[in-house]
Amino acid sequence: MRIEKCYFCSGPIYPGHGMMFVRNDCKVFRFCKSKCHKNFKKKRNPRKVRWTKAFRKAAGKELTVDNSFEFEKRRNEPIKYQRELWNKTIDAMKRVEEIKQKRQAKFIMNRLKKNKELQKVQDIKEVKQNIHLIRAPLAGKGKQLEEKMVQQLQEDVDMEDAP
């Protein structure tokens, strides 16, 4: 069973699904859904349409250069069936998928870390600019006045008790 890629959005196309368009020069275009086919007919660039994988890779939102992508290449050479080779291949595919997911998760976390640092710098800058909103000029004076009043009252009480 061969799973094709959509020409426009790079999504998977399973057997019996999607649409195929063959141009006069025998170039084959496969589309996973009518949305992709319509955008192709409108001559839209997949790298500029925000929901496509091409846009995500071009904008640096997804991992693009990695050795794990080499295993996904299309191979058209028929190989003689051997049970051992088949089992090893399936085990290797599982391992490669596991490694790829770890690397993608790490890439996303690194990307998010940069944004957190920028957000922190912006927050500090905003607090410095609007410090008067956070701390009123007479905020500490109220406590000082209260303490003075308490001291004066205690002194008055002490003076009255002394004679």
Swiss-Prot record:
Gene Ontology biological process: ribosomal large subunit biogenesis
Molecular function per GO: structural constituent of ribosome
Keywords associated with the record: Nucleus, Ribosome biogenesis
Domain of life: Eukaryota
Claim: Endoplasmic reticulum is one of the keywords in the record: no
Single GO cellular component term: nucleoplasm
InterPro entries hit by this protein: L24e/L24_sf (IPR038630), Ribosomal_eL24 (IPR056366), Ribosomal_eL24-rel_arc (IPR055345), Ribosomal_eL24-rel_N (IPR000988), Ribosomal_eL24_CS (IPR023442), TRASH_dom (IPR011017)
Compartments reported by the entry: Nucleus, Nucleolus
Signal peptide: none
Subunit description: Associated with nucleolar and cytoplasmic pre-60S particles. At the end of biogenesis it dissociates from cytoplasmic pre-60S particles and is likely to be exchanged for its ribosomal homolog, RPL24.
Protein name: Probable ribosome biogenesis protein RLP24
Gene assigned in the entry: RSL24D1
